[in-house]
């Protein structure tokens, strides 16, 4: 090979390698370095063994609920004692969130026989099994004042379920590839991971009000501070949407792209979690990342009873972290 051509090829190769290296080390894939500390520096007030895995945290007025595998179950924790007080076995893996409403815990199940399990919140037993399947894993479920809401296919069919009959009372078409709903102030909000939008549906009429463009591939979402917050798996950002005018008011660089994760609201802060970066705090008053904890753990969380309840999915653990403690770090 002629020497000049060889040198040119080497130069091109080095340039491509440098570009790939730069892309791979981009801060957007490493979190926000300047505010990072080890997740192991946090001292939980309690850590509870849930099962083979632990996922989908739910806070109710008097309990914390979390799903497990090995066994397939939904466990109830008493926040006064941090003890498991009930283990409700279900037919398969709880794969698309947990919701509370109408005295019941609603549990979408994936696997060989996808269905929707209804748990009596007073008796801690399965009261009904509905032949209504979630659209996909990493989806969600929500309750409003009179209905249960769940997407049941990849085409964007939002089912409105009547809790008095356990039947579907309305089917609403939303953008395909939408899976995760949350209810807030009369509106059901659903993220569209395939279309990168957040869709607002009137919870009274079922009318689609608007689809708002947010960050790339939004999936998990939370309501708080007059806003809806979406965790965008495609670019690792968090989008803030004003509930009143349905406008994006902030796009926050968090640097946590990729599958899985969760997001919650509490202590006037937004709390995303993903593997590798188990916890991030965003100050809702400034839309700034204040602190980011890196290391093992994370994947699902909720705030309640003065605490963050966060799972270590892979180890099957649920930890309780006092908000008063974590807000000082």
Residue ranges and their predicted role:
Residues 4-12:
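Sec-dependent N-terminal signal peptides
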Residues 13-329:
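Predominantly soluble domains enriched in secretory-pathway, periplasmic, or organellar proteins
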């Amino acid at each position: 090979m002629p020497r000049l051509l060889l040198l040119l090829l080497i130069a091109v190769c080095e340039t491509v390698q440098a570009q790939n290296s730069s892309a791979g080390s981009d801060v957007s894939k490493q979190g926000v370095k300047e505010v990072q500390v080890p997740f192991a520096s946090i001292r939980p007030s309690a850590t509870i063994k849930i099962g083979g895995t632990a996922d989908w945290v739910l806070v109710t007025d008097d309990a914390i609920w979390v799903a497990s595998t090995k066994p397939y179950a939904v466990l109830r924790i008493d926040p006064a004692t941090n003890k498991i007080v009930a283990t409700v076995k279900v037919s398969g893996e709880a794969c698309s969130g947990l919701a509370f409403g109408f005295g019941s815990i609603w549990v979408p199940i994936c696997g060989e026989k996808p269905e929707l399990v209804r748990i009596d919140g007073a008796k801690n037993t399965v009261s009904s099994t509905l032949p209504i399947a979630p659209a996909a894993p990493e989806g969600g479920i929500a309750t409003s004042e009179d209905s249960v809401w769940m997407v049941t296919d990849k085409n964007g069919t939002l089912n409105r379920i009547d809790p008095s009959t356990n039947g579907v009372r309305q089917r609403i078409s939303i953008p395909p590839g939408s899976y995760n709903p949350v209810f807030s102030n009369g509106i059901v909000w659903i993220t569209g991971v395939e279309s990168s939008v957040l869709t607002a549906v009137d919870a009274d009429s079922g009318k689609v009000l608007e689809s708002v463009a947010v960050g790339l591939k939004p999936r998990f979402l939370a309501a708080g501070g007059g806003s809806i917050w979406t965790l965008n798996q495609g670019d690792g950002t968090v989008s803030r949407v004003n509930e009143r005018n349905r406008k994006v008011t902030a796009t926050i660089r968090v640097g946590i792209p990729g599958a899985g994760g969760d997001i919650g609201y509490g202590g006037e802060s937004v709390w995303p979690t993903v593997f590798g970066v188990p916890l991030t705090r965003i100050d809702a008053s400034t839309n700034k990342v204040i602190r980011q904890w890196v290391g093992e753990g994370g994947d699902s969380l909720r705030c309640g009873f003065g605490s963050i309840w966060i799972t270590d999915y892979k180890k099957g653990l649920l930890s309780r972290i006092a908000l008063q403690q974590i807000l000082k770090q």
